[in-house]
């Protein structure tokens, strides 16, 4: 009997130790996930530093300061407005207009008016997810990464509007583009409940198609109204080449953008082992398909290099060589 009691005590002790080890492992995994997404945010800020330098380098001297201020203000206003309403739109609209906003969540249960209002408004009960909360290690870093996606979309359109738009007008456009237009597209095609995904099987791992399509068509719509840069065309209709004032600045911006791309795509991976994870043993895309950082390393390095080489072979022009990389 004494032996049985001792054995039972040992089993209980081992059970307690195992529970403690599991708890510690979960804490470690949670802290790693938080740090992982946190580090993607400053990497993505480098994208904006890169776009700022890239655009300023391609601007004529008289408009350099205006170009830089335009980028800084767009960055700041997009993040603030994404906090106020952009994040809410992302969670509220995935199934709209296929279903009504009030008809409930999608098949994953992470969308719809009720769900968005519970987690994505910066006031009321949902403010616990939109501010400091010692028990929440995910909402803040997820929001930060998504906010940088929104700001990146605005930065892409900014380059097409060099020397064509006033600062206040551009800030308004950046808010509409980054905190609404792109967010709606992301809700439809870059969300597991999005109707483009559930109805048509649309997949866009890094949101590259959504970001560039929305930013590109948005910029095109503005350009159709604004017209060409002052001094681009002569009276006889012939075109003038408007060269940037500082190519080294543009090249530096390009390299910063490449660094930022790694952070952008890192943030697109759903890490394993958490309550919000797809799997317990491997990373996944936002759609639940398997993905690894190794795959991203191959793709980003080869894509950037291939773009530079291809543009150099066909143009021998420094600007188009850099644009080929982008």
Could you say what each language-model-derived stretch is?
Residues 6-326:
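Hydrophobic alpha-helical transmembrane bundles of multi-pass membrane proteins
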Residues 1-5:
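N-terminal amphipathic/basic-hydrophobic helices that include classical n-h-c signal peptides
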């Amino acid at each position: 009997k004494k032996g049985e009691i001792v054995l039972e005590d040992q089993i209980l002790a081992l059970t307690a130790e195992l529970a403690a080890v599991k708890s510690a492992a979960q804490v470690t995994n949670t802290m790693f996930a938080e740090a992982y997404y946190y580090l993607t945010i400053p990497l993505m800020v480098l994208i904006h530093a890169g776009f700022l330098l890239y655009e300023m380098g391609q601007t004529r001297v008289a408009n350099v300061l205006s170009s830089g201020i335009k980028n800084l203000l767009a960055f700041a206003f997009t993040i603030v407005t994404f906090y106020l309403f952009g994040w809410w739109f992302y969670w509220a609209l995935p199934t709209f207009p296929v279903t009504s906003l009030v008809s409930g969540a999608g098949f994953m249960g992470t969308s719809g008016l009720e769900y968005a209002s519970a987690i994505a408004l910066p006031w009321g009960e949902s403010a616990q997810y939109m501010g400091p909360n010692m028990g929440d290690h995910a909402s803040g870093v997820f929001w930060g990464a998504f906010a940088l996606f929104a700001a990146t979309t605005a930065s892409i359109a900014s380059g097409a509007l060099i020397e064509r738009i006033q600062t206040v007008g551009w800030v308004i456009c950046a808010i509409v583009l980054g905190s609404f237009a792109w967010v709606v597209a992301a809700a439809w095609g870059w969300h597991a409940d999005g109707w483009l995904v559930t109805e048509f099987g649309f997949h866009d791992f890094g949101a590259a198609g959504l970001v560039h399509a929305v930013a590109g068509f948005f910029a095109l719509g503005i350009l159709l109204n604004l017209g060409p840069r002052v001094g681009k065309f002569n009276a006889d209709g012939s075109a003038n080449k408007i060269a940037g004032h500082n190519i080294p600045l543009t090249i530096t911006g390009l390299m910063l953008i490449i660094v930022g791309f790694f952070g952008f795509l890192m943030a697109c991976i759903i890490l394993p082992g958490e309550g919000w994870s797809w799997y317990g043993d491997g990373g996944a895309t936002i759609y639940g398909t398997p993905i690894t950082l190794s795959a991203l390393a191959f793709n980003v390095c080869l894509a950037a290099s291939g773009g530079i080489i291809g543009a150099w072979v066909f143009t021998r022009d420094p600007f188009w060589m850099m644009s080929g990389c982008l």
